[in-house]
Swiss-Prot record:
The enzyme's E.C. designation: 2.4.1.-
The organism of origin for this protein: Arabidopsis thaliana
Residue runs in coiled coils: none
UniProt protein name: Cellulose synthase-like protein B3
Family: Belongs to the glycosyltransferase 2 family. Plant cellulose synthase-like B subfamily.
């Protein structure tokens, strides 16, 4: 219960950033874009079809920059003061923590175990926490790893809290040896804890190599004759916290779950798993707040739960309007500089409107909001309005909306009325938990429609996020130092392309479903600028077409002897526009501590993913809208550095995180993802070669130096592909891709020259 005294300092404060200089720069770039469009309109009759195509592409780019300017206009974030929480709140609320995994091959069980251990060790009363791991792959190996991790947690959690360890994921913490100034007691405990973690890692590694012996144990009987897409519901209470209030070294509840899957039933991928987590946790612990993290995003800040509670428990007029608290997704490797910059500027910009979007991980949700409440259903004090009480608490309505389970209905009523959760034995809820995991349980209910994580898109995070904001809720953004959660990005290559395609396809699905911001901005409670922010995100896939065309236009104009850019003094519009944008984006990177090399790599990868990966989201969404095929959620392969090298020598955290000699190289395979990029590169190289040997006579009104510079710029941006033409192995472009791209490039050159 929170102390309502207004004389005490606040638990959090909103920080608004007003940088008028950056607003001027954004508007200036927008002005140059509009000037270029106006110039093309005025000279449209004097030029050919190339001019029209360029105008259409630049119109799309101008629209995107208009959206960016709107987003970045009033950035904001929150600063929390978790050290004030204990003196302000006498009884901290419970929190249910969710971890999702789906494939023990692509998501190593030891990585999932480390994420689990980091959550179990956070600085929060153990009797107020419960951790649920959803294993959509129904893997005995994953269960074994987590069961072993729960044993190690009885050593790890007390060690972390005794010495106030900062990094609470063992695989990261043990990368650095203890300082020489540490006490002998600490050094002894450190060695013991490290040895136990190494034993855990070896047991998991041995089980990975030969898991047949797992079938012999009684605890693994439920996993016999199971397949990832065909198995019954499994719910196991791995560890139950029976300690009292104030027992610091206790380990929180830990429950393993795997919902039923059958080949003939839709399971809705991660969104379906999240909704099962909500139901099981509602039956067992029913905490008012829920944290969800991906299996590779460990808790890096021990006070992360307290920081989120500072937002939810702050006494103010709008405290009850906050639906979720989102922490930025940050990474310990060198592959995520671009995302860090994107979150720092655009993320804070969206946070200053109606609140950040839900990013799928590192987010604290309020259970009542996930149960479908609208902002209009609450009184000023956060209690249900009389109309909402009649609407939601009628038993027949609840059964129809939430499913035919008396225990589930009871837990929903308690959650909506904010009743304290009685400390029941978890085993008493096992039968009901099994029931709500059946494939048919959601049939003719509102799960995935208006309740829980929303279906109809593989980007369940964005779909759910706009659904929450459309009901009038706000959200909050906290970016603490050190970062609250850390993970690893897939390296540039097939896995990155796969991930980007999945994101772009899922976002386009939301753009064309009933949650579309094009609908919401006019008839829902979402703010207009928030709708524009979502529109910017959901159109990622659509950008692939104008960007692909614009990468080919300079080459076409050189080969065809046609003008693409303005002539004379008007060329200054393009030169100034390109120069300002480059300097502006470079400043954004360098102001966050990144290098020029990092900035260039980001610019290059942005062009590559847009023209290569995002491009495939277009046919994906077209085929889905036509009912020909359905989009599929493919799990991205997760990797983790090893604490010990093969020779047994330790690697430091710096050695693991910093790029090695191969980290900057782009990886290729024979998939179609790399065909567009190779084609673009070959076309521009051919145009430059043709220009240098005089394939076309360049007369006064045709192409010239500006178009040649455009081709050079495209080649520079696709430098990883140029290097890939001369590399071998996974860093080289396969011959099959090169031959296909070369054939298409020849057709393009013949068409351009002869047209």
């Amino acid at each position: 219960m929170a102390d309502s005294s207004s004389s005490l300092p606040p638990l959090c404060e909103k920080i608004s950033y007003k940088n008028y200089f950056l607003r001027v720069v954004d508007l200036t770039i927008l002005g140059f874009l509009f000037s270029l469009l106006l110039y093309r309109i005025l000279l449209m009759n004097q030029n050919n079809s190339v001019w029209v195509v360029a105008f259409l592409c630049e119109s799309f780019f101008s629209f995107i920059w208009l959206l960016i300017t709107s987003i970045k206009w009033s950035p904001a974030s929150y600063k929390s003061y978790p050290e004030r929480l204990d003196e302000r709140v006498h009884d901290l609320p419970s929190v249910d923590m969710f971890v999702t995994t789906a494939d023990p091959v692509r998501e190593p069980p030891i990585l999932v175990a480390n994420t689990l251990l980091s959550l179990l060790a956070v600085n929060y009363p153990a009797n107020k926490l419960a951790c649920y791991v959803s294993d959509d792959g129904c893997s005995p190996l994953t269960y074994f790893s987590l069961k072993e991790a729960s044993k190690f947690a009885k050593i790890w959690v007390p060690f972390c809290k005794k010495y106030n360890i900062k990094v609470r994921a063992p695989f990261r913490y043990f990368l650095n040896p203890p300082a020489a100034t540490e006490s002998s007691e600490f050094s002894k405990d450190w060695e013991i804890t490290k040895r136990e973690y190494e034993k855990l890692s070896r047991r998991v590694e041995d089980a990975t190599g030969d898991s047949h012996w797992l079938d012999a144990e009684d605890d693994f009987e439920d996993f016999s004759n199971t397949k990832p897409n065909d198995h019954s519901t499994i719910v196991k209470v791995v560890w139950e916290n029976k300690g009292g209030v104030g027992v610091e070294n206790e380990v929180p509840h830990f429950v393993y779950i795997s919902r039923e899957k059958r080949p003939n039933y839709l399971h809705h991928y991660k969104a379906g798993a999240m909704n099962f987590l909500v139901r099981v946790s509602g039956l067992m612990t029913n905490a008012p707040y829920m944290l969800n993290v991906d299996c590779d995003m460990y808790a890096n800040e021990a006070d992360v739960v307290r920081q989120a509670m500072c937002i939810f428990l702050q006494k103010s007029m709008n405290s009850n309007h906050c639906a979720f608290v989102q922490f930025p997704q940050e990474f310990y490797d060198s592959n995520a500089d671009e995302l860090t910059v994107l979150q720092s500027y655009l993320g804070r910009g969206i946070a200053g409107i109606q609140g950040p979007t839900y990013a799928g991980s590192g987010c604290f949700h309020t259970r009542r909001v996930m149960y479908g409440l609208s902002i209009d259903d609450l009184e000023d004090d956060g209690s249900l309005s009389s109309l909402a009480t009649r609407k939601y608490l009628a038993e027949e309505n609840l059964a129809r909306e939430f499913g035919n389970s008396n225990e589930m209905v009871t837990s929903v009523v308690e959650a909506l009325q904010r009743k304290p959760n009685p400390q029941n034995t978890l085993a008493n809820s096992l039968e009901a938990a099994q029931e709500v995991g059946h494939c048919h349980f959601e049939y003719q209910t509102s799960w995935g429609k208006t309740i829980g994580w929303l279906y109809e898109s593989t980007a369940e995070d964005a779909n759910t996020s706009i659904g929450i904001h459309s009901r009038g809720w706000t959200s909050s953004y906290i970016s603490p130092k050190p970062p609250a959660f850390l993970g690893a990005m897939p390296p540039g290559g097939p896995e990155a392309m796969l991930q980007q395609r999945r994101w772009a396809t899922g976002l386009l699905e939301v753009l064309f479903n009933k949650q579309s911001p094009l609908i919401g901005m006019f008839c829902r409670k979402i703010r207009f600028r928030q709708s524009l922010a979502y529109l910017y995100i959901f159109t990622w896939g659509l950008r692939s077409i104008p960007e692909l065309i614009y990468c080919l236009l300079p080459a076409y104009c050189l080969l065809h002897n046609a003008a693409l850019f303005p002539k004379g003094v008007y060329l200054g519009i393009v030169v100034t526009l390109v120069g300002m944008h480059c300097l502006y984006s470079l400043w954004e990177f360098m102001s966050l501590g990144f290098s020029v090399q990092s900035w260039f790599a980001s610019q290059s990868f942005w062009r590559i993913k847009t023209t290569c990966s995002w491009l495939f989201s277009i046919p994906d969404i077209i085929l889905k809208l036509l009912g020909i095929s359905k989009t599929v959620f493919i799990v991205t392969k997760k990797t983790m550095p090893k604490t010990m090298s093969g020779s047994g020598s330790e690697k430091s955290q710096r050695e693991v995180d910093c790029p090695n000699q191969d980290s900057g190289k782009f990886e290729f395979d024979g998939s179609l993802y790399f065909l567009p990029g190779t084609f673009i590169l070959l076309v521009n190289l051919a145009a430059l070669a043709g220009c240098s040997v005089g394939l076309q006579r360049h007369r006064g009104g045709g192409s010239g130096l500006a178009e040649a510079c455009g081709c050079i710029l495209v080649v520079i941006l696709f430098l990883p592909f140029l290097k890939g033409m001369f590399e071998k192995g996974k860093y080289g472009i396969p011959w099959s891709t090169l031959s296909k791209a070369a054939f298409l490039a020849v057709l393009f050159v013949v068409f351009s020259v002869g047209n």
